[in-house]
Amino acid sequence: MAKKEVAKIKLQIPAGAANPSPPVGPALGQHGLNIMEFCKTFNAKTMEQKGMITPVVITVYSDRSFTFITKTPPASVLLLKAAKLEKGSGEPNRNKVGSVSMAQVEEIAKLKLPDLTAKDLDAATRSVLGTARSMGIEIK
């Protein structure tokens, strides 16, 4: 008999740095999952991306087992890394905090394409451009 799906948990965790403290511990603990087992498997799977914020969708089953899917880092995190910034502008319409090239934007769009609802690379690029604009990052 197939396992019954009980819940889906969505978290954003630094790759290779999951630990039982919040937000991971409480989110998994309330569903009765083995927190250390998740942390070990997540850290092993994301070791090569160490430090990047990684969205993860954890599927919890009725027998307290779980599976998880890692996604690509958010476009905002990738844009900040490309522009070598700590954070975006508080007033993106007035203050521009950095800039990225169109080639960098297209590279981010290629990376994000599997996780976006965009049908093609052009639509994904426009989505990343909108994210950059909302963060106060100029496009060269």
From Swiss-Prot:
Which keywords accompany this UniProt record? Methylation, Ribonucleoprotein, Ribosomal protein, RNA-binding, rRNA-binding
What is the recorded post-translational modification? One or more lysine residues are methylated.
Name the SMART domains on file: RL11
Q: Does the keyword Cell division apply?
A: no
Q: Look up the record and report any one GO term of the cellular component aspect.
A: cytosolic large ribosomal subunit
Q: Which InterPro entries match?
A: Ribosomal_uL11, Ribosomal_uL11_bac-typ, Ribosomal_uL11_C, Ribosomal_uL11_C_sf, Ribosomal_uL11_N, Ribosomal_uL11_N_sf
Question: GO annotations under biological process?
Answer: translation
A single GO molecular function, which one? large ribosomal subunit rRNA binding
According to its UniProt entry, what is the function of this protein?
Forms part of the ribosomal stalk which helps the ribosome interact with GTP-bound translation factors.
Family annotation (PANTHER family): 60S RIBOSOMAL PROTEIN L12 (PTHR11661), LARGE RIBOSOMAL SUBUNIT PROTEIN UL11M (PTHR11661:SF1)
The family annotation for this protein states: Belongs to the universal ribosomal protein uL11 family.
Question: What do we know about how this protein assembles, alone or with others?
Answer: Part of the ribosomal stalk of the 50S ribosomal subunit. Interacts with L10 and the large rRNA to form the base of the stalk. L10 forms an elongated spine to which L12 dimers bind in a sequential fashion forming a multimeric L10(L12)X complex.
Q: Under which name does UniProt file this protein?
A: Large ribosomal subunit protein uL11
